[in-house]
Amino acid sequence: MIPIKTPVGEFKVWIKRFGTNPKIKVLLLHGGPAMTHEYMECFETFFQREGFEFYEYDQLGSYYSDQPKDSSLWTIDRFVDEVEQVRKAINADKDNFYVLGNSWGGILAMEYALKYQQNMKGLLVSNMMASAPEYGKYADEVLAKQMKPEILKEIRDLEAKKDFENPRYMELLLPNFYKEHLCRLNEWPDGLNRASKHVNGEIYTLMQGPSEFGISGRLAKWDIKNRLHEITIPTLMIGAKYDTMDPKAMEEQSKLVKKGRYLYCPNGSHLAMWDDQKVFMNGVIQFINDVNDEKVN
């Protein structure tokens, strides 16, 4: 556990280090907001094999970290400040610090880079568009239309009534949306099941909304697409065919940053780290090694 200073006091966050490598330190930022590191345990085998030093970490408010009740804490800026405190605690710097964020973790990683890229060696954005309104539009105009009309209608009716506690809501979303676009494995991995069970629903709903189907919480208007050109460090943008995020938008983002590379996962979804694992991990490892060897420009 490491201490984090916030405007409303000091709290502790859970972090676990693997390996020792003064040249490569990777911090993993989970999604949600307020999921847990557990669904990112799949990096362990691959990163340890490469000899990377890396960190699993539960952001403040998540299951293994302190969970203060003050809702003023759940803002992007406050989370960015937290990541900077974590960086200092693990003694990472511009010569070795890589941030890999998935989903909400991708929002946090991009925002962190916009403020603190002078302290980073590389940025990896896994399955997160740089515009929440465009993500919402993709959910409405592309993904929703792939559902059977009667199922979509029932989901929309429940949403209109704000009846999110109704078990039917997840009953509909799980097979028709989550299994199509979140993780396509027939059997969901243990780590993902644990993370889903441990999500802090209060923070998730406040920031994201009631589900992964679009976005309606505090993050709904978030958009930094027109600022991506400010990111000058080597950056990997990862998209996947079946993702909740438009893979074409992910590719475009790789061109908007100064030193971008695009990784496409043809069999993957939002958690391509699980359902297109070989392509995903090979691409991520290749990128980190290339940045380390100064091959990304």
UniProtKB/Swiss-Prot annotation:
It catalyses: Release of N-terminal proline from a peptide. Transmembrane segments: none annotated. Belongs to the peptidase S33 family. The keyword Protease applies. One of its GO terms (biological process) is proteolysis. The keyword Phosphoprotein does not apply. Its EC number is 3.4.11.5. GO terms for molecular function: aminopeptidase activity. This is Proline iminopeptidase. GO terms for cellular component: membrane. Residues 26-131 form the AB hydrolase-1 domain. Disulfide bonds: none annotated. The active site is at S103, D243, H270.
